[in-house]
Amino acid sequence: MASAGSGMEEVRVSVLTPLKLVGLVCIFLALCLDLGAVLSPAWVTADHQYYLSLWESCRKPANLDIWHCESTLGSDWQIATLALLLGGAAIILIAFLVGLISICVGSRRRFYRPVAVMLFAAVVLQVCSLVLYPIKFIETVSLKIYHEFNWGYGLAWGATIFSFGGAILYCLNPKNYEDYY
């Protein structure tokens, strides 16, 4: 503390820790992976005869070269999966914007907890959608050929994992780690 007569002022500096920066990168990667998962045409594929995305289901009879596609938005479980996944992605987007704004504005520390809570909420929504999807798919769609959950489904899991990682990084208290920076 400086005396009033010396002309020195007390300046508070908020240091951006690498943990929070890596957390923000995790959130950004989660957003990119969510976008790829939602737009992916391949959540389930089966021997070049069937594919299922969040938006449409297509079949190709073995003896024809024409695909027959229909919207998946007529099925309650597929609408629920899409709503949960998009809800989680929206929360991740809000958390990313809050995290980005907190870096640009000097008061970062007060935004850490809300970002972490939003990310944990998004993880819960996305895990629910990713568990619901294969259970209801196997229950309702009877394929007599080999099928596999494809890269669109994997991207959604990747987004969920990166969101969880970002949430953990935003939970860490930088005061406990000042010696390392």
UniProtKB/Swiss-Prot annotation:
Gene symbol of the encoding locus: Tmem47
Q: What family, per the record?
A: Belongs to the TMEM47 family.
What function does the entry list?
Regulates cell junction organization in epithelial cells. May play a role in the transition from adherens junction to tight junction assembly. May regulate F-actin polymerization required for tight junctional localization dynamics and affect the junctional localization of PARD6B. During podocyte differentiation may negatively regulate activity of FYN and subsequently the abundance of nephrin.
Q: How does it assemble?
A: Interacts with CTNNB1, CTNNA1, PRKCI, PARD6B. Interacts with FYB1.
**Annotated transmembrane regions:** 21-41, 83-103, 115-135, 152-172
Pfam families reported in the protein's UniProt record: PMP22_Claudin (PF00822)
Q: Name positions with the PTM N-acetylalanine.
A: A2
Q: Where in the cell is it found?
A: Membrane; Cell junction; Cell junction, Adherens junction
Gene Ontology CC annotation, any one = plasma membrane
Instruction: Give the matching InterPro entries.
Output: P53_induced, PMP22/EMP/MP20/Claudin
Topology within the bilayer: Multi-pass membrane protein
The free-text tissue note of the record is:
Expressed in podocytes (at protein level).
Domain of life, per lineage: Eukaryota
Q: What is this protein called?
A: Transmembrane protein 47
Keywords assigned by UniProt, alphabetized: Acetylation, Cell junction, Membrane, Transmembrane, Transmembrane helix
- Recorded source organism is Mus musculus
